[in-house]
């Protein structure tokens, strides 16, 4: 393979990654959420959502309602949590939410940050679930939990890139 073909292949790969990044950012802007797509990582929302389901979020609604399924993040923790709004309270121009997993016995008070009794809708919510695809996100779980699967996939992708003659 000559230099021109290698550069063309490199540009094609860069184009794919750039296109994916631009699509992600556009979706983030439209949904008004820094993470408009998340994967369910636990069984806390069964039977509504199963582990591995992909959730599509929307954060343009002014307020969440009791019964809505929301995704939130706790300060200092990087894993988003998918649970249903159990109660809501209103303060001065603020909405506070108490959440609970459908499959959990207790509300999420023990999951919140220290001295935090409710989620702040503006600062803690990533978005409200509007649609989902069942089991499609299970590949993400396999990639994070199984290092052999991750290395096999990376090896396959690298080998495919080397062997493709385009």
From Swiss-Prot:
Q: What EC number(s) does its UniProt record assign? A: 3.4.21.89
What is the membrane topology here?
Single-pass type II membrane protein
| C-terminal short (CTS) helix, as annotated region | 152-163
User: Which coarse location class applies to the principal site listed for this UniProt protein?
Assistant: endoplasmic reticulum
Q: Which CDD domains match?
A: S26_SPase_I (cd06530)
Disulfide bond sites: none
TM spans (from-to): 10-31
State the family it belongs to.
Answer: Belongs to the peptidase S26B family.
Report any Pfam family annotated for this entry: Peptidase_S24
What is the primary gene name for this protein? SEC11
- According to UniProt, the name of this protein is Signal peptidase complex catalytic subunit SEC11
What's one GO-annotated cellular component?
Answer: signal peptidase complex
NCBIfam families to which the protein is assigned, alphabetical: sigpep_I_arch
Comment on protein domains = The C-terminal short (CTS) helix is essential for catalytic activity. It may be accommodated as a transmembrane helix in the thinned membrane environment of the complex, similarly to the signal peptide in the complex substrates.
What SUPFAM superfamilies would the database entry show?
A: LexA/Signal peptidase
Q: Which reaction does it catalyse?
A: Cleavage of hydrophobic, N-terminal signal or leader sequences from secreted and periplasmic proteins
Query: What is the role of the protein in this entry?
Result: Catalytic component of the signal peptidase complex (SPC) which catalyzes the cleavage of N-terminal signal sequences from nascent proteins as they are translocated into the lumen of the endoplasmic reticulum. Specifically cleaves N-terminal signal peptides that contain a hydrophobic alpha-helix (h-region) shorter than 18-20 amino acids.
Q: What spans does the record annotate as topological domain Cytoplasmic, numbered to this chain?
A: 1-9
Give its localization.
Endoplasmic reticulum membrane
Recorded superkingdom = Eukaryota
- Give the matching PROSITE patterns: SPASE_I_1, SPASE_I_3
Subunit annotation: Component of the signal peptidase complex (SPC) composed of a catalytic subunit SEC11 and three accessory subunits SPC1, SPC2 and SPC3. The complex induces a local thinning of the ER membrane which is used to measure the length of the signal peptide (SP) h-region of protein substrates. This ensures the selectivity of the complex towards h-regions shorter than 18-20 amino acids. SPC associates with the translocon complex.
Query: A Gene Ontology MF term for this entry?
Result: serine-type endopeptidase activity
Active-site positions on this chain: 44, 83, 108
User: Could you tell me the Gene Ontology terms of the biological process aspect for this record?
Assistant: protein targeting to ER; signal peptide processing
- The residues on the Lumenal side of the membrane are 32-166
What keywords is this UniProt entry annotated with? Endoplasmic reticulum, Hydrolase, Membrane, Protease, Signal-anchor, Transmembrane, Transmembrane helix
């Amino acid at each position: 393979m000559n230099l021109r073909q290698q550069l063309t292949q490199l540009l094609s790969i860069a184009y794919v990654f750039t296109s994916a990044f631009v699509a992600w950012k556009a979706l983030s802007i439209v949904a008004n959420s820094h993470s408009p797509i998340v994967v369910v990582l636990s069984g806390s929302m069964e039977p509504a959502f199963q582990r591995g389901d992909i959730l599509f979020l929307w954060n343009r609604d002014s307020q969440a309602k009791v019964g809505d399924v929301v995704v939130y993040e706790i300060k200092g923790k990087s894993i988003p949590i998918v649970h249903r709004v159990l109660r809501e309270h209103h303060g001065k121009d603020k909405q506070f939410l108490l959440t609970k997993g459908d499959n959990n016995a207790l509300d999420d008070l023990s999951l919140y940050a220290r001295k935090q009794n409710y989620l702040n809708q503006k600062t803690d919510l990533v978005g409200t679930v509007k649609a989902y695809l069942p089991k499609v996100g299970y590949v993400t779980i396999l990639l994070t939990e199984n290092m052999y699967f991750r290395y096999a996939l990376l090896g396959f992708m690298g080998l495919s890139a080397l062997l493709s003659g385009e």
